[in-house]
């Protein structure tokens, strides 16, 4: 089959890593795959993509006649049968694609990689509202939030109606999609989770090789990741567990603030590593702590579990329950509308930090659970999708 991935960008983000992993897997299984990206690709992501995958760069992120013509030429030259639009929002990729494929027998799939009813723009307004006590400004912010929410809802509904299949990452997002978009019976909505994108086939779990280390892996920002919560939790553990350490692997706009937070608290065993290859950290760490305000289907969860790292995750999005069974293969930290409870999270971590037998049991269960998200298993599900699309032509 001839498949094209349509990308807004092809850099080092999670969506791009998923696309690179799937594209490379499809090629290994005999498919012909090309990638078209509106903006120039990052060398690191290109390097992790199978060299048999040809990558084309369009002329910027716009639905222009030039981009439509360029994309149409790619579709025809490679006799594309299926396009996977990895940006289920916003409208530009969908509109450009539909103009480019006009008159061609091509099936389309749009994938939305986040929680259905929120995004960075909406969350920014909510953050501003938390700190605003001026009645007039609050009214303006509420109106802004309503406008952003409406635009997001209408855009999502538009893309859904102009694609053959629309994918979300969790079964729990199906009713949320209907509520958010107003589409009561979304008959071509489907659930498809992301694969583990990091190869752990050469990893042999040994409890004795695991260090007493908690890690955070990812971007350091306030809007989504809320890494300050990781530090708040660690402040309640550092003195009690002098042989444990916290390692922050990642970078971002909030890093300086988080480093200041660590200094202000007088914490001694916190290391900031910047962006690094995650595998060595997964191989040695015992626990991963993720305290995001919202997510879609975080790649780091299944990834860390495949290396026997126990995930401790704030239950701020419904997909958490798809991945983790609390107390068996991970820890689900309860969500509270009034805010993250660091003391409660610390108590839950405390229970396994001091219990080696429990940690080993949970690590082994996590490894077993991660197999549900192996690349080959997810590939098999994609094959069924392709078959269904083409046989229902």
Please place each PLM-identified region on the residue numbering.
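A short, active-site helix/loop in glycosyltransferases that binds the activated sugar's phosphate group
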Residues: 145-188
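Short His-centered aromatic/hydrophobic patch
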Residues: 85-92, 112-115
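Aromatic "clamp/platform" in nucleotide-sugar-dependent glycosyltransferases that forms part
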Residues: 293
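N-terminal strand-loop element at the rim of the active site
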Residues: 5-13, 19, 25-63, 173-176, ...
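Nucleotide-activated donor-binding/catalytic signature segment of Leloir-type glycosyltransferases, i.e.
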Residues: 54, 257-275
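Short hydrophobic beta-strand element within catalytic cores of glycosyltransferases
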Residues: 310-314, 324
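A conserved mid-protein helix/loop that constitutes part of the nucleotide-sugar donor-binding site
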Residues: 16-21, 212, 221-236, 253-259
């Amino acid at each position: 089959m001839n498949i094209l991935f349509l990308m807004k960008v092809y850099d080092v983000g999670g969506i791009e890593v998923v696309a690179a992993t799937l594209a490379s897997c499809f090629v290994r299984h005999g498919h012909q795959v090309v990638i078209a990206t509106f903006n120039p690709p990052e060398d690191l992501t290109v390097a992790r993509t199978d060299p048999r995958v040809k990558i084309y760069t369009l002329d910027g992120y716009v639905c222009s006649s030039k981009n439509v013509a360029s994309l149409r030429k790619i579709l025809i030259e490679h006799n594309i049968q299926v396009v996977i639009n990895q940006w289920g929002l916003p409208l530009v990729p969908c509109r450009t694609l539909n103009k480019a494929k006009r008159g061609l027998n091509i099936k389309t799939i749009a994938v939305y990689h986040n929680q259905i009813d929120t995004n960075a723009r909406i969350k920014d307004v909510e953050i501003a509202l938390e700190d605003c006590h001026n009645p007039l400004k609050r009214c303006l912010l509420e109106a802004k939030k309503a406008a952003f929410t409406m635009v997001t809802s209408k855009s999502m509904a538009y893309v859904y109606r102009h694609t053959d299949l629309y994918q979300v990452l969790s079964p729990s997002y199906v009713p949320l999609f209907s509520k958010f978009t107003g589409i009561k019976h979304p008959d071509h909505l489907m659930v498809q989770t992301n694969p583990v994108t990091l190869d752990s086939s050469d990893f042999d779990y040994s409890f004795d090789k695991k260090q007493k280390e908690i890690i955070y892996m990812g971007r350091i920002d306030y809007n989504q990741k809320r890494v300050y919560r990781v530090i708040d939790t660690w402040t309640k553990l550092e003195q009690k567990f002098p042989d444990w350490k916290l390692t922050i692997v990642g970078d971002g706009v909030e890093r300086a603030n988080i480093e200041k937070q660590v200094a202000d608290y007088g914490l001694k065993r916190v290391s900031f590593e910047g962006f690094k290859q995650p595998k060595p950290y997964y191989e040695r760490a015992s626990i991963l702590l993720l305290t995001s305000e919202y997510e879609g289907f975080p790649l780091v969860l299944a990834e860390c579990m495949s290396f026997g790292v126990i995930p401790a995750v704030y239950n701020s999005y419904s997909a958490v329950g798809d991945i983790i069974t609390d107390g068996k293969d991970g820890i689900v930290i309860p969500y509270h509308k009034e805010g993250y409870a660091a003391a409660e999270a610390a108590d839950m971590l405390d229970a396994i930090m001091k219990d080696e037998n429990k940690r080993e049991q949970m690590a082994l269960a996590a490894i077993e659970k991660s197999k549900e998200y192996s690349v080959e298993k997810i590939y098999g599900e994609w094959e069924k999708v392709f078959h269904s699309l083409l046989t229902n032509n």
